[in-house]
Amino acid sequence: MLSPKRVKFRKQQRGRMRGVATRGNTIAFGEFALQAQECGWITSRQIEASRRAMTRYVKRGGKIWIRIFPDKPVTMRAAETRMGSGKGNPEFWVAVIKPGRILFEMGGEEITPEIAKEAMRLAQYKLPVKTKFIALGDEEKTAGAKTPAASKAVTVES
């Protein structure tokens, strides 16, 4: 599973998720992508489950790029622990997702739009946020749109 090798601080505050993604919101490597429609946290386990689902479907046909990385530690206290006595220990890692963020990309000579769409649909079921499938041509047309929800891309909502 994905996690940072080393971090400056072991624990982080939860923070707020406001606005839309300003970075990582365009297709950079492949021809097809899965774009987030709402904000949320995606754990390293969910990223791995999505990756496995896509990889199993496309087999050796193409290449998959993971465009998010879980770099935020989530701490938890032991069950039935009284209040106080500090913050809990880091239990797992999450990636903070904002609307418009590209989560996964897919490309290759053997990857058709139908194969990519089905593989991304399988990955959508593993994720806790609403997403949509976009292709390289669709994404360029919607670059001027203010929000990802306003885009005219091919949508497959989960």
Curated annotation (Swiss-Prot):
What are the alphabetically sorted keywords of the record? Ribonucleoprotein, Ribosomal protein, RNA-binding, rRNA-binding, tRNA-binding
Which PROSITE patterns does UniProt cross-reference here?
A: RIBOSOMAL_L16_1 (PS00586), RIBOSOMAL_L16_2 (PS00701)
One GO cellular component this record assigns the protein to is: ribonucleoprotein complex
Question: Which named protein is this?
Answer: Large ribosomal subunit protein uL16
Kindly state the subunit structure of this protein: Part of the 50S ribosomal subunit.
Which species does this protein come from? Synechococcus sp. (strain CC9902)
Q: What does this protein do?
A: Binds 23S rRNA and is also seen to make contacts with the A and possibly P site tRNAs.
Identify the InterPro entries for this entry: Ribosomal_uL16, Ribosomal_uL16_bact-type, Ribosomal_uL16_CS, Ribosomal_uL16_dom, Ribosomal_uL16_sf
Q: Which NCBIfam families match?
A: rplP_bact (TIGR01164)
